Structure formats: C-alpha cells, structure tokens
UniProtKB/Swiss-Prot annotation:
Signal peptide: none annotated. The gene is glpK. Activated by phosphorylation and inhibited by fructose 1,6-bisphosphate (FBP). Pathway: Polyol metabolism; glycerol degradation via glycerol kinase pathway; sn-glycerol 3-phosphate from glycerol: step 1/1. Key enzyme in the regulation of glycerol uptake and metabolism. Catalyzes the phosphorylation of glycerol to yield sn-glycerol 3-phosphate. PANTHER family: GLYCEROL KINASE, SUGAR KINASE. This is Glycerol kinase. GO terms for cellular component: cytosol. Pfam families: FGGY_C, FGGY_N. The phosphoenolpyruvate-dependent sugar phosphotransferase system (PTS), including enzyme I, and histidine-containing protein (HPr) are required for the phosphorylation, which leads to the activation of the enzyme.
Length: 496
C-alpha cells in the first residue's frame, strides 16, 4: 500500500527529508546540515557530493525513525535552493568544481561586463530577470572559464550542468534522467520564459554549450525512478520538482491569479501568482515561472528582501538584546510604538524595489528616551515595511489588488509582527497550520503526478488556517508610519 509521499528539501544550509500523508500532514522528518565554503570574501560554495551524501543520510534516517518501508512511498518530490549551479563530468559523475551558491558574488565582474556590452534589456525581456551574480548563468560561465580543461570538455559534450534539483534527480536515477522543471530553469539566465526553451542568444552571450543543459519538463511529472541501490532496493517514481519559493507558493495553495505568499526566512521572498501571463515589471520585481502543470504554465512576480529573520538574529547575537528570538515579541509589545524610531536593516544592501547593494544599515529618530524595547520593535516593524514596499510594486505591476496575504517561515510565529504586517498592508494576513509549505509544495506536485492526490481542488481543501490577523489600525496612522519609513530609506540611500 502506497501510503506516503517523500519530500526532499535541499536548502542553503541543510538538507531535509519529510514524509507526508494523504491529508498533507507531516508524519516524520529528518535534517542534516552541511559545510559552507567561503574561499574568498563574498564567495559562497558547497560541495555537491556532500549535499548528495546529506540527502541519502536524511532519507535513511527519516524512513527508519518513522518505521516506513520504501515500498510504502508513492513518489518523491524535490524542492531546492534555487540558482546554485553544479557542473559535473558525464562519465565519472563527479563535479569538476564546488557548487557555486546563489548568494555568491564571485561572478559580479562578469555581470558588469555583460551590462557594459548592453545585454540588460534583452536579458530582461527573455528571462524576466536582471543581470546579476545571483542567477546561475554566469556561475556556469565562471566554472568553464576558470577550471582547467573545462571548456574543452564542455565543447566535446562531456560535461553536464544542473541546478541542485537536476543534480539530485540525476544521482537518484543513477544518471538516467538529466532534467529540470520550468521554475528552476527560469532562474538560470539561459531560459526564455515565453517560448519555454533554452535560448541560443543567451547561451552565446554566456558562452555555454547547449549540450550541457538538462531537458526542461513540467513541475509535476514522473521524471524517472530511483535506482534500487540508492533507495533500499526500490524503484520509486521521482515525480515533482520546484524551486523553493515556487514550491512554497504551491504548498500555500495560491493557485488563483492574484494570490500571494510571503516567506519570512533569513530574508523574505514574496510571490504573486499572475496566472498564465508573464507580467513585466516596471518596479524592480522579477518575472518568473511559478510552475508548469497539466500542460499549462503559471507565472509569478517575485520580490526579494535581503534581511528579515537575520535582523532578529542580529538583535540576539550581535546586539545581545535577548537570548531567544521568541523574546523579541515580548519586548516589542511592551511599548505602544517605536516613539519615532526607524531601523533600516540594509546590512547587505537593499533588494526589491531599490536594488542598491551599496547601502548599509541605519537607525533614525533616536532620542534620550529611546529604549531597548523601541529598538527591538523598530527592527521587527522594518520587516513589515519592506514587505509593503514589495506589495506596492506588485500591485502597480499587476494591476491586482491583494485580498489576503498567506505567510510562512520562521518569523511568522511572532504574533506582534503578523498583526503589524496586517495593519501596515491593510489586508488580512493568514498563517497556515502547516508551516513547512516549501516541502509540502514539492510533495503535492509529486503526489498529483502519481495520482496520490486527484487535483488542485483536493489540495486547496487541505489548506487549513492557524490564525488570521485582521487590520485594525486607522488608515491615517498606517500611512503616516509608512511615510516615515520611506523618509528613512531615502536618508539611508544618501549615506554611502
């Protein structure tokens, strides 16, 4: 009896295996961290073999601790840190260099050169992205240009490229399936999101041979099976793949046009489903593919906030204002307001809609009466203001007014933050019972492909709300507070 779906969530700092049942509930999970490599300032790399080892380890731990047999698994879904690039030898199956992580800035110079050559507009039109070291394309070029003999091997068809999903499917299937899904392909800077093909003009710009690239498939489909020696003698269908933020949008059941979710992790990622049309952004958002399913492709607008949960960690570890992140809510609730204090947590620059990597964090409105409580509250409020910045851009680009915002991620446990978020946006904020929406989204995609769940309507009914936060703040007050934030942003940008 096929009782479960196994979701593999390969993140930036750890790998997780999560078993879900028919109701979309977590049966068991296992997690394993792996090493971060920083060869030079601003560079971030992972050992792809170590990632693969961590995946095998969490699968084994999860199944044995849950006392679940491999033959009880109906299918495997994979979700992954996006943009991180792996290049490996087709014959030996070994990576020729470390995986270059999405956060890594080692290709910034390549990006500057491409911008100087005037490629920005063409890239934006075809991919919906900006030329930035964040995306996979320049990472692949860097590996081919800097690893001895790599370019020659690539030209001869001996090397393969993949984002982490591709690497894991390739390994699980014993090298039989070299595939990715639409959502991951749309983050590479090499994929045309309108005609759904690898784009020759983009590949020429990056000097990447087409033979390296995986086949692009829908996000919910059987791509292959596990090879028995990697999966306890069983051939289990590998049936769903999506990048982490898109998987969270699916896990939140944001299937309708205009539905949006915000994930509060280290940073924040807000995605709005724009249906079957790619909406070009005039306000600093990315246009991306949400997923491909049932012969259709859904698009999304995406906003990135670089610092969110990490600002709370900074209060805890850097400023030593409390011992546990949950205490931030207690302190923030002790004061009626920030008393005019604003914190702009631009520790690594500002993301959407400003895209300014030069600015740094700042604090405004401090008086002799400012206390620790004001400071903590102002830092928490900054997450809500940044989210409003992104939402304003989304509404302007899409022409869609948001009805409710679904939220997930570590910081959503903070009731003060969620209530303030609702007040500042003037829309209800909904927190689900199951917060593991990324892994759940991948499980749903896999389950649909193997018939474990019938359709998206069945999934929609499984979304249950833990708490709904309604806006109660006077419009005049919230507008005044937000105007103060915009002033703080301008002042921060002026100080460089």
């Amino acid at each position: 009896m096929k009782k479960y779906i196994l979701s593999l969530d390969q993140g930036t700092t750890s790998s997780r295996a999560i078993l879900f049942n028919k109701k979309g509930e977590i049966v068991h999970s296992a997690q394993k961290e792996f090493t971060q490599h920083f060869p030079k300032p601003g560079w971030v790399e992972h050992n792809a073999q170590e990632i693969w080892g961590s995946i095998l380890a969490v699968i084994a731990t999860c199944l044995s601790e849950a006392d679940v047999k491999p033959e009880q698994i109906a299918g495997i879904g994979i979700t992954n840190q996006r943009e991180t690039a792996v290049v490996w030898d087709k014959t030996t199956g070994k990576p020729i260099y470390n995986a270059i992580v999405w956060q890594s800035r080692q290709t910034a110079e390549i990006c500057d050169e491409l911008k100087e050559k005037g490629y920005s507009e063409m890239v934006r039109e075809k991919t919906g992205l900006l030329i930035d070291a964040y995306f996979s394309g320049t990472k692949v070029k860097w590996i081919l240009d800097n690893v001895e003999g790599a370019r020659e091997k690539a030209e001869n068809g001996d090397l393969l490229f993949g984002t982490i999903d591709t690497w894991l499917v390739w390994k699980l299937s014993g090298g039989k399936a070299h595939v990715t899904d639409y959502s991951n392909a749309s983050r590479t800077l090499m994929f045309n999101i309108h005609d759904l093909q690898w784009d020759d003009e983009l590949l020429d710009m990056l000097t990447v041979p087409k033979s390296m690239l995986p086949e692009v498939r829908p996000s919910s489909e059987v791509y292959g099976e596990t090879i028995d020696y990697h999966f306890f003698g069983q051939n289990v269908p590998i049936a769903g793949v999506a990048g982490d933020q898109q998987a969270a949008l699916f896990g939140q059941a944001c299937f309708g046009e205009g539905m949006a979710k915000n994930t509060y992790g280290t940073g924040c990622f807000m995605l709005m489903n724009t249906g079957e049309k790619a909406v070009a952004s005039e306000h600093g958002l990315l246009t991306t593919i949400a997923w491909g399913i049932d012969g259709k492709v859904n698009y999304a607008l995406e906003g990135s906030i670089f610092v969110a949960g990490s600002a709370i960690q900074w209060l805890r570890d850097g400023m030593r204002m409390f011992k546990d992140a949950s205490e931030s809510e207690v302190y923030a609730s002790r004061v009626e307001s920030t008393d005019g204090v604003y914190v702009v947590p631009a520790f690594v620059g500002l993301g959407t809609p400003y895209w300014d990597s030069e600015v740094r964090g700042a604090m405004f409105g401090v008086t002799r009466g400012t206390t620790k409580e004001h400071f903590i509250r102002a830092t928490l409020e900054s997450l809500a203001y940044q989210t409003k910045d992104v939402l304003c851009a989304m509404e302007a680009d899409s022409g869609i007014e948001l009805k409710t915002l679904r939220v997930d991620g570590g910081a959503v446990k903070n009731n003060f933050l969620m209530k303030f978020q609702s007040d500042i946006l003037d829309v209800p904020v909904e927190r689900p019972v199951i917060n593991e929406t990324t892994a759940l989204g991948a499980a749903y995609l896999a389950g649909l492909a193997v018939g474990y769940w019938k359709n998206q309507d069945e999934i929609k009914e499984q979304w249950h709300m833990d708490k709904r936060f309604e806006p109660t703040m006077e419009a005049e007050t919230s507008e005044e507070l937000y105007a103060g934030w915009k002033k703080a942003i301008e002042a921060t940008k002026a100080f460089k």
